[in-house]
């Protein structure tokens, strides 16, 4: 048992899916996993372990932002021996050719967070995905008839930015989309020598102002989840 995860040794699989929303973790466990058992309810951040096509897989909610996901990733790796971490979540498109409900695979993650500046004594670090997981996810998506967008994303600390046009600078440099966790995930995976990948579904577009409803997100984001489960 760790501070924020109430699981016993052996309760968590070596591969863990990481939705930000704990209710999405519960939904995945109840609808896509066989023989799913809840191992964590601490702070309402549900965690489940079950089986997908015979493979043992866990799914653990992380909350929003780099500090929150960093807590769970640290504990999953150091206390429970997790080897593969796959974030599944939503993002906002920064490019006109990336539409709502598209799949984005994060090859790397730029960030406006200071967390790596602190860790690396003021220097920059380039948080990068596991190539092994990235290739598997890309190939599986194509096999499923999906053409994912692959590239650099932005991990931001600010959901409500004081400058609503600040995203345009990142877009100018080819950043595909914005979310709030991946730079933290990839950095910790590198620190501990494990594999990590982020697969995202576009929930809204900063370019066009389009957005999906909560109901649409629940229905249309299953492609992302199925890609993650297939490569688990």
Curated annotation (Swiss-Prot):
Keyword DNA repair: no
Enzyme class: transferase
EC number: 2.4.2.1
Protein name: Purine nucleoside phosphorylase DeoD-type
Catalytic activity entry: a purine D-ribonucleoside + phosphate = a purine nucleobase + alpha-D-ribose 1-phosphate; a purine 2'-deoxy-D-ribonucleoside + phosphate = a purine nucleobase + 2-deoxy-alpha-D-ribose 1-phosphate
Organism the protein comes from: Caldanaerobacter subterraneus subsp. tengcongensis (strain DSM 15242 / JCM 11007 / NBRC 100824 / MB4)
UniProt entry tagged with the keyword Plastid: no
Protein function: Catalyzes the reversible phosphorolytic breakdown of the N-glycosidic bond in the beta-(deoxy)ribonucleoside molecules, with the formation of the corresponding free purine bases and pentose-1-phosphate.
Residues the record marks as active site: 204
Cellular compartments per GO CC: cytosol
Pfam entry (one): PNP_UDP_1
Taxonomic superkingdom: Bacteria
GO annotation (BP), single: purine nucleoside catabolic process
Entry keyword set: Glycosyltransferase, Transferase
Complexes and interactors: Homohexamer; trimer of homodimers.
Residues binding a purine D-ribonucleoside: 4, 179-181, 203-204
Site (Important for catalytic activity): 217
Family: Belongs to the PNP/UDP phosphorylase family.
GO molecular function: purine-nucleoside phosphorylase activity
Residues that, per the record, bind phosphate: 20, 24, 43, 87-90
């Amino acid at each position: 048992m760790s501070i924020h995860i109430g699981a016993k040794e052996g309760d968590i699989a070596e591969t863990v899916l990481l939705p930000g929303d704990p209710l999405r973790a519960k939904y995945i466990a109840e609808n896509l996993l066989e023989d799913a058992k809840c191992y964590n309810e601490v702070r309402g951040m549900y965690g489940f372990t079950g089986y997908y096509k015979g493979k043992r897989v866990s799914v653990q909610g992380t909350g929003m932002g780099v500090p929150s996901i960093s807590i769970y990733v640290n504990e999953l790796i150091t206390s429970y021996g997790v080897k593969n971490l796959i974030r599944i979540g939503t993002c906002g498109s920064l490019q006109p050719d990336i539409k709502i409900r598209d799949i984005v695979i994060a090859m790397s993650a730029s960030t406006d967070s200071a967390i790596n500046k602190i860790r690396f004594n003021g220097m920059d670090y380039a948080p990068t995905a596991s190539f092994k997981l990235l290739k598997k996810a890309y190939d599986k998506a194509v096999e499923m008839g999906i053409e994912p967008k692959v590239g650099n994303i932005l991990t931001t600390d600010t959901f409500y930015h004081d400058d609503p046009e600040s995203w345009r600078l990142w877009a100018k440099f080819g950043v595909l989309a914005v979310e709030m966790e991946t730079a933290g995930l990839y950095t910790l995976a590198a620190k501990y020598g494990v594999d990590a990948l982020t697969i995202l579904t576009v929930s809204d577009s900063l370019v066009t102002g389009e957005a999906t409803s909560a109901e649409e997100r629940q229905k249309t984001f299953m492609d992302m989840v199925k890609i993650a489960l297939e490569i688990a």
